[in-house]
């Protein structure tokens, strides 16, 4: 047989024998019944079931697993014979023979049956008279156990040492806890490293902190739990992207091209905290709100439409946080930088609190009881916060993030936020706002009206590629789950029982 043909065939490594029950046994006991047990033997390995007392139709349902010493294949010269010997336990004297059966495993495997449940007739010993001794029901299943490195304990066990050897170890300063013992292990535990070389220790810690490779190789290789825990990093990168959109159109396209390149690992570096606070201070200025009101205020937009391709692909199935004040005007940048710098420390502390939103709050939409009180009181602790230019934008952004963009809450809405009465808007812009008609609240084109034709094409191509990769990944997961379910049903069908009854193991004979 060629190696290519042999690689395509399935060869078992173990055989699992389950002795279910027996019937029509000859009575050997005093009261016309038997105390019956069965010996299961393959090669030199033996197992025994428990004793079913005072019955002629015992039921055991006990299994024993044997490792095949060689390769079981069609046309193999080596024969594997499974022996089942039914015995009656005798309290006085030797146990009495009730019957036996010899099953050729090669014939069952050549019939291409991985599992076989059948009644076998019990036979007499060789040279004895043939008579009806009853039947036994047995389930035979061929299995393949892939022996990986994780299934072995590579650490060597301590041997029994003489008192002189132990005294010798004490003289050499060896300890009994295994730190300085002469045992070896392939898996080295992490121990305390000396501080003599700090550069080596820091490099070693960086190597240990490297994450393991995921199981499935694909574009979306991280689990949903990992991706949901990294939502804060994606929000920071999206805010950095929005702050970079201030300026001419060619700068916008350049920023989109630079941010659109997502590495294959699905992670994106978050900007520096000080740089982020400086950029978001420009976003939260009143000038940006006025400019938003003049151009696109009053339009009902979908909170999910401003998701750009800069976000990693693992966040594709989760709701994003939307900043309602996307645009800002250049004349306000230079004048409002003076107001944003004194409150930079306070904004950093608020942003850290907002980043620490738990995974439970993101999924269920529930929040702490303190947050609604803060919103009702105006979102500030002191009156000076109300006068600051970023107080309104910070509170409005918090309210929008937790109430508007979370589709799991009952208060989900896709409409834009109206400015408060404390915010001063010039009368000309307010008159223009009244003339703008109300559009569809779920207008998907609202976030793309400020983009050029080339930028819209780039977004379309990126979204189509993202959907294609997602469909491929979902199809791979479905196939994997289907194959896994079929294997579970074939290998252990008892797991589908309601209620689940674990199978009993037969006792193994020890060579004494």
Swiss-Prot record:
Q: What is its main location?
A: membrane
Polar residues: bias regions: 221-231, 277-287
- A Pfam match: C2
Q: Which residues form the FIP-RBD domain?
A: 437-499
Motif NPF 2 in this chain: where? 406-408, 440-442
Span(s) of short sequence motif NPF 1? 323-325
Region (Necessary for interaction with AP2A1, RAB11A, subcellular location, endocytosis activity and homooligomerization), start-end ranges: 465-512
Where is the region Necessary for its cellular translocation to the plasma membrane?
15-102
For region Disordered, the annotated ranges are 174-231, 263-287, 347-390
Where in or outside the cell it occurs: the entry states: Cell membrane; Recycling endosome membrane
- Phosphoserine, modified sites: 227, 277
Q: Where is the composition biased (Basic and acidic residues)?
A: 347-374
> What the entry says about post-translational processing?
Phosphorylation at Ser-227 by MARK2 regulates epithelial cell polarity.
Q: Which UniProt keywords apply?
A: Cell membrane, Endosome, Membrane, Phosphoprotein, Protein transport, Repeat, Transport
Q: Which GO terms describe its molecular function?
A: protein homodimerization activity; protein kinase binding; small GTPase binding
Stated membrane topology is: Peripheral membrane protein
Assembly and interaction partners:
Homooligomerizes in a Rab11-independent manner. Forms a heterooligomeric complex with RAB11FIP4. Interacts with AP2A1, MYO5B, RAB25 and REPS1. Interacts with RAB11A and RAB11B (activated GTP-bound form). Interacts with NPC1L1. Interacts (via NPF motifs) with EHD1 and EHD3. Interacts with TICAM2; this interaction directs RAB11FIP2 to the phagosome. Interacts with RAB14 and RAB25 (GTP-bound forms).
Indicate what this protein is called per its UniProt record.
Rab11 family-interacting protein 2
Organism this protein belongs to: Mus musculus (Mouse)
Identify the gene encoding this protein: Rab11fip2
